């Protein structure tokens, strides 16, 4: 029984997240339904990062097992044909060893958070950015972000319903940059870690936003982390600005 690794891109706006639910549309359900329509088999997908409702992906990775040894380009093209018109694309398919696990074999995950920083409304990207109309200082945000790097208890930045056994995580990257293209002003937060807590990236983004408008200092952010003072964090940044951008394997 061959195991297939899929690289997947999707717009999270119409979905209630990755994970299959009984009555709501999800990315997992869409792909598994396409697999059944294509192969006649019932397969269960395992992904690298289970994204929440409204969160996007440009390089999600998942694996599944099928009884038949299909050509990988056939798997890719057949799934894409059966996924239309849903905003989900299979970018590639390859056969991998049975030992490969899209979730447990991952050594690093990468996310990007986008903030549209202007007063005029977002005409084209409203489902992919968090619009903050007041001025933000990206350099102040970056300085505050550096205080979150390393191995810490991230209790202040986890959802109340987070099911992780431990709040300890090692944040390897958290960079904040401003992108300017004419009148286009976007702040991009790029972050990497082996794993993240539920809502961790969005919670950090909301807190860094407060640093950007000078309501929190870098020292304040460090103190929030050290004390677990969740009430001092910024708002939970909306899901629409978050994108799963990649995953590393050994």
Curated annotation (Swiss-Prot):
Catalytic residue list: 52
SUPFAM superfamilies reported in the protein's UniProt record: Pseudouridine synthase
Domain of life: Bacteria
Keywords assigned: Isomerase, tRNA processing
A Pfam family matched in the record: PseudoU_synth_1
Reactions the enzyme catalyzes: uridine(38/39/40) in tRNA = pseudouridine(38/39/40) in tRNA
Listed GO MF terms: RNA binding; tRNA pseudouridine(38-40) synthase activity
Any Gene Ontology biological process: tRNA pseudouridine synthesis
EC number in record: 5.4.99.12
Binding residues annotated for substrate, in chain numbering: 111
CDD domains assigned: PseudoU_synth_EcTruA
Alphabetized Gene3D superfamilies for the sequence: Pseudouridine synthase I, catalytic domain, C-terminal subdomain, Pseudouridine synthase I, catalytic domain, N-terminal subdomain
Record text on subunit structure and interactions: Homodimer.
Record family assignment: Belongs to the tRNA pseudouridine synthase TruA family.
Name listed for the protein in its UniProt record: tRNA pseudouridine synthase A
UniProt source species: Methylorubrum extorquens (strain PA1)
